[in-house]
Amino acid sequence: MYRIGEALIGSGNEVAHIDLIIGDKEGNAGAAFANGLTNLSLGHTPLLSVVRPNLMTKPATLIVPKVTVSCLEDADKVFGPAQTAVARAVADSVEEGIIPEEKAEDLVVIVSVFIHPEAEDYRKIYQYNYGATKLALRRAMEGYPSVRKVLSEKDRGSHPIMGFRAVRLWNPPYLQVALDLDSMEEMERIINTLPDRERILLEAGTPLVKKFGVGVVRRIRELRRDAFIIADLKTLDVGRIEVKMAADETADAVAISGLGTVESIEKAIHEAQKQGIYSILDMMNVENFVDKLRGLKYKPDIVLLHRNVDLETLRAERGEELGEMSEWGNIREIKEILGPRGLVAVAGGITPSKMQEALDSGADIIVVGRYIIGSRDVRRAAEDFLEHMPQDPDTMRLPLDEDEAI
């Protein structure tokens, strides 16, 4: 039996990132410990963690450098402040009861340590690695994080080294701005004018894609690096190729026409799943779209419904119950088919005064085109809709509050 812990503390070149395993000396952890100590790797030579020369810590701890140690200067950082920090963190964890003292002889710890080659401040190297090791040990012994914690955080944060946010639609509602334009200059002007809000999704409209190609998505990305960008391809055929083209240009989602055959739609949705992007099934002019959706083996992530003024009359003529009906159809029925993660977008002449009705009907995404892009005051027009939505997720969340609750 062994436990796993991880922690990142600090900033700059002295930042500490600790990965560790703690487990029984007689089990898999002990075997890994012995293997690491006896099978040396050039530039990554493991060393026992000592509080001071001739006094190794308990539980016995093996330090493995993550970054290649290429010179004596690098070795000094590992054998000096990093080794001391890890040893004292382990010993203090025993003293504080994080590691049971009675188990200290029966356990071993393997600590993978990151030391940047350009780190210079030995005090910071010590401080950050001490804190990170101790935190990683506590997390390992307490089983942090829980699966529920991981699921609740996976779409919220961003990795500092990655340099950008991979946006996921985890907290609707959202405002999708349809850039149905034929001018690159006008597109750039509108994007630069829109509020920088997480709740705004940018759609490369069909006219833009037809005139400038799917590469227009990358231009939008240059203007709004962390935006959620939709390529409105209205794919009818060869869906796999078109979806891959959109994904290659960094689109987060691609719109597929619901008028296509079941086979074509499923291939496009499957390709979107392979590429790791959202699939949007556009039900414009699709009759019996509920039946079509039910017949799909692979369900889309999002269904786009368009305002149909004749729908209510048609259902009434059939003698069907209208209680759950909206101008876009029975949104809640669509959601039941899609499952708990499915989203519904609605489009068609929506104004700020009409928006609340759409949200109350169950819509997750409000698609707006002319009201915003045709406005003399694009920013104000977008804010008219955003006023009906909650603040962006985590607006009031303090830094570091994403970690353990205490």
Swiss-Prot record:
The keyword Lyase applies. Residues 162-406 are annotated as: 3-hexulose-6-phosphate synthase. The active site is at 17 (proton donor). Pathway: Carbohydrate biosynthesis; D-ribose 5-phosphate biosynthesis. GO terms for molecular function: 3-dehydro-L-gulonate-6-phosphate decarboxylase activity; carbon-nitrogen lyase activity; hexulose-6-phosphate synthase activity; hydro-lyase activity; orotidine-5'-phosphate decarboxylase activity. Gene3D superfamilies: Aldolase class I, Formaldehyde-activating enzyme. Residues 1-161 are annotated as: Formaldehyde-activating enzyme. SMART domains: OMPdecase (SM00934). SUPFAM superfamilies: Ribosomal protein S5 domain 2-like, Ribulose-phoshate binding barrel. GO terms for biological process: 'de novo' pyrimidine nucleobase biosynthetic process; carbohydrate biosynthetic process; L-ascorbic acid catabolic process. Its EC number is 4.2.1.147, 4.1.2.43. Keywords: Carbohydrate metabolism, Lyase, Multifunctional enzyme. Substrate binds at residues 19, 48, 66, 68, 83. It catalyses: 5,6,7,8-tetrahydromethanopterin + formaldehyde = 5,10-methylenetetrahydromethanopterin + H2O; D-ribulose 5-phosphate + formaldehyde = D-arabino-hex-3-ulose 6-phosphate. Pfam families: Fae, OMPdecase. NCBIfam families: one_C_fae, PRK13307.1. Catalyzes the condensation of formaldehyde with tetrahydromethanopterin (H(4)MPT) to 5,10-methylenetetrahydromethanopterin. Catalyzes the reversible formation of ribulose-5-phosphate and formaldehyde from 3-hexulose-6-phosphate. In the N-terminal section; belongs to the formaldehyde-activating enzyme family. In the C-terminal section; belongs to the HPS/KGPDC family. HPS subfamily. This is Bifunctional enzyme Fae/Hps. It comes from Methanothermobacter thermautotrophicus (strain ATCC 29096 / DSM 1053 / JCM 10044 / NBRC 100330 / Delta H) (Methanobacterium thermoautotrophicum). The lineage of its organism: Archaea, Methanobacteriati, Methanobacteriota, Methanomada group, Methanobacteria. The gene is fae-hps.
